[in-house]
Amino acid sequence: RWAAGDALEQWQNQVFLLQSELPEVALEQAREPLSFSLFSQPECVEQPERLAQVFALLVNAHYQTSPNDLFALLQDEAMTLFVAYQGEVCVGCVLAVREGELDAPTIEAIQLGTRRPKGHLTPVTLANQLGISQAARQSCWRILRIAVHPDCQRQGIGSQLLTHFIAQHHADYYATSFGVSEDLLPFWLANHFVPIKLGSHRDQASGCYSLLMVRGEHLDWLEQAKQQFSAHWIFELSDSLQALEPQIIQQLLPSTVALPQPLIPLELIERYARGGANYESVAVWLYAWLLATAPSLESLSPLLISKILQRKSWAACAEQFQLSGKRQVEQAVRTEILALLVNLQCKYTLPI
């Protein structure tokens, strides 16, 4: 640990901008119009006070921001910094990196697992894990960080930053990868990014699952990526993603592409909801039915997500939802299924 007032610690913090102060946004400044511009690497070097203000935003917004990010920002020609100002105060910034445009031999090596070129997370993931080589040939801007001044949050500045950044930085598509949470995901969904790859393990630093999202127009491969995402993450809900929070599942379900389903016996499901049959005999149909109807639902109850989609045990559900045991859990499941049937007013053709 540093001694109180240690001169070396003070020097280190000053050089690496680790304790730069965020200026307050005065009321008169908050009324000024926003201005958006590129903050180039030469400008970062020539204007250290301005750089310190921008980097303070990044440190404040992202706990993993480190001196390595500062070095990359100043040295990596593939990186860019885009800022928003109100008066003299930086109220938002986007840090992004250029990816893609890889040649055919490199893409083939990526798909065979023999190469993983540094600085190309999105195209490598798409080519290696989804088998989409076209995305690796195309150009991409990946958003590494986006930060908004604490005094100016919940005012749409982040969305405006993205809009202006995309307008001024052409690419075939745009991407972002982050530790998914119920607070962050709605922002990216609202800005027309779609999920295409959900990690199977929680990040040790953030404690969250990593989610890769993309945005682009006229992408021949995007529908394929969405279908693969839908099949993969739903399949993993009962295995590697069993601990994924129901609130995040609720937010992801509307992005799920409806996959072909067998004819679903709704009469059997309704009879179960009213007390007939047993859970094991209808579980497969409940699973297929929820997946078929999920894209049209505004929300799905955490209990149905946990029991039917994540296939948790009765005991685990009882503990999670503070119910006494299997009988009480199953009764709650039946009640919610019946309510869902009534609300949806399903019109499937039923087999006899």
Where are these regions (language model features)?
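A glycine-rich phosphate-binding loop feature that marks nucleotide/adenosyl-phosphate handling sites
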Residues: 29-31, 71-80, 179
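Structured core elements
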Residues: 83, 93-95, 142-147, 175-177, ...
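Short coil/loop residues immediately preceding or within conserved phosphate-binding loops
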Residues: 79, 138, 143
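Short, basic/aromatic recognition patches
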Residues: 61-73
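Terminal substrate-recognition subdomain of acyl/acetyltransferases
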Residues: 1-63, 101-139, 167-352
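Conserved beta-hairpin
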Residues: 78-98
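Short secondary-structure subsegments characteristic of cysteine-rich extracellular domains
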Residues: 70-75, 213-217
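Conserved acetyl-CoA-binding loop-helix of GNAT-fold acetyltransferases
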Residues: 145-167
